[in-house]
Amino acid sequence: MKNKLAYICSPYRGNAYKRIRNIAYARHITRVALELGYTPIATHLYLPQILNDDIPAQRRRGLKAGKDILNTCGTIIIGAKYGISEGMASEIEAATGKDTIIII
């Protein structure tokens, strides 16, 4: 049986306006993934509620947790509408060999 877990990769950081926009976009991509039959995992929708993304040590911890979760997923879904952030580029590099879906 194919692994239907899909890691949602889209921007998060930015000023208050961009964060609101980016969170809405991540929710949209997550909804699309569900409609495509995937079980989506969007770590940037819940880890910032626990960790402070503006504190470098906590950001690194969150990025590592995300990559650990990414390793369990068969697919990465990339939301590229607002570009590829540094964090996204790192996740995309870590996802080499996984099925990839790009949503713009």
What are these regions (language model features)?
Residues 1-104:
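Catalytic phosphate/metal-binding cores of nucleic-acid and nucleotide-processing enzymes, i.e., regions
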